Amino acid sequence: MDSQGPIILEKSIKIEEVIKIAITSIIDIVTKTVTPEIKAPYELVDVEYDKMGSDYILSILVDKEGGITVEDTSDLTNIISPLLDTIDPDPFPNQYMLEVSSPGLERPLKTADSLKAAVGSYINVSLYQAIDKVKVFQGDLLAFDGETLTIDYLDKTRHKIVNIPYQAVAKVRMAVKL
């Protein structure tokens, strides 16, 4: 503060944006720390850090061929928990609960490799901006060449094909066909 009063930023930053940046930073740090230690047959699927009620939850989603067992999650927790304690400086502003689990049926597809492996699967795609007035597509992933997702989806009762540029994708996950 100077003699003229408080300094006012030209652009106002919403508290939600600051929190989102902090969470992204925590996720990046945790991902870089645990990735080298999660070895075959396991695959790191995702890292999430969320507030649920008054608690913070750090979720490490791991999978393997044939699925994850309770014993697997226990073994991985015993590897991951001490690793997180070694991060310096501590990125966590609050105490958190560590949850190591399977990604479940609607697992996120975070990488180009995971999308290539999902060709032929039923997926849910959220976009940054709408294509033909649609921002969320759910359908069969027909192809992914690294740049474009080709999806067969239902528009009311008609099958349609849409090509979605990979850079337009905000989020992709597996979906359950009902």
From Swiss-Prot:
InterPro entries recorded: Ribosome_maturation_RimP, RimP_C, RimP_C_sf, RimP_N, RimP_N_sf
Keywords: Cytoplasm, Ribosome biogenesis
Annotated transmembrane regions: none
Gene Ontology biological-process entries: ribosomal small subunit assembly; translation
GO cellular component, one term: cytosol
Alphabetized SUPFAM superfamilies for the sequence: YhbC-like, C-terminal domain (SSF74942), YhbC-like, N-terminal domain (SSF75420)
Pfam families, per database record: DUF150_C (PF17384), RimP_N (PF02576)
Record has Cytoplasm as a keyword: yes
Subcellular location: Cytoplasm
Function recorded in the entry: Required for maturation of 30S ribosomal subunits.
NCBIfam families reported in the protein's UniProt record: PRK00092.1-2
Family: Belongs to the RimP family.
UniProt-recorded name of the protein: Ribosome maturation factor RimP
Originating organism: Streptococcus pyogenes serotype M4 (strain MGAS10750)
Gene: rimP
